[in-house]
Amino acid sequence: MGHLTPVAAPRLACAFVPTNAQRRATAKRKLERQLERRAKQAKRRRILTIVGGSLAAVAVIVAVVVTVVVNKDDHQSTTSATPTDSASTSPPQAATAPPLPPFKPSANLGANCQYPPSPDKAVKPVKLPRTGKVPTDPAQVSVSMVTNQGNIGLMLANNESPCTVNSFVSLAQQGFFKGTTCHRLTTSPMLAVLQCGDPKGDGTGGPGYQFANEYPTDQYSANDPKLNEPVIYPRGTLAMANAGPNTNSSQFFMVYRDSKLPPQYTVFGTIQADGLTTLDKIAKAGVAGGGEDGKPATEVTITSVLLD
């Protein structure tokens, strides 16, 4: 909240008194400046937003929003589970969130995968994945990710999120992930993930393209309010980080403890038992400098990602 600045009394006999219209115009300009500043900040950060309350009430009542930064270039200015300006400092003690919805394939699943340019340029030279129709068979693709902290076996859900799997496999085969660090670990009760996939290592890098959300987002209609209500992303989930709808790129996160998120983060696989053991070890070491959100205390570097 801004501070009121004392103003010297005017020397004129009749002080200027702003009209209601002038006060409204001043307030409007102040709000526009605040929104502009926030828009610039949001452009530099990818965010995961956990929303409590109803969208319909947002215009009248401030919903409880707990924001955790995904693309974090200034950890000192944004800490774990940082509330927005008018939000509560703690998540609502609501009933347990529902599970992810059952997967129901659409008629056009994998029929037209597109990877348009993203606002940010590629950190590494990379070719676009195959576009257009991609196969959904085999249903699952086994991948071995090797890190300096141990192996993380992955099973990609090609039958549920084929465009995402197509991109991930393409990047893996081009060596995009080799030598990259997992730049973010969260350990809060609401969110327990290890985030990787950025060659810059600070949460701002990607392959120079983006693509649309798939499961579970595609199980809802576009205007369904449940898209903004938390569901459980269970332990062992492999999902994409994003900066909003349809902005998936190379960054992904691995859930090592049940976490609550709106169903707007594409799930494209699961983590094998060896991978969960590795993640548990990384999580046990905690976040560098303490806290619940930041770089892992134990550096995690991906040495290879290979199809089995």
Swiss-Prot record:
CDD domains: cyclophilin (cd00317). The lineage of its organism: Bacteria, Bacillati, Actinomycetota, Actinomycetes, Mycobacteriales. It catalyses: [protein]-peptidylproline (omega=180) = [protein]-peptidylproline (omega=0). Residues 139-307 form the PPIase cyclophilin-type domain. Belongs to the cyclophilin-type PPIase family. One of its GO terms (molecular function) is peptidyl-prolyl cis-trans isomerase activity. Keywords: Isomerase, Rotamase. It is an enzyme of class 5 (isomerase). The gene is ppiB. Pfam families: Pro_isomerase (PF00160). PPIases accelerate the folding of proteins. It catalyzes the cis-trans isomerization of proline imidic peptide bonds in oligopeptides. Transmembrane segments: none annotated. Residues 74-123 are annotated as: Disordered. This is Probable peptidyl-prolyl cis-trans isomerase B. InterPro entries: Cyclophilin-like_dom_sf, Cyclophilin-type_PPIase_dom, Cyclophilin_A-like. Residues 77-97 have a biased composition (Low complexity). It comes from the Bacteria.
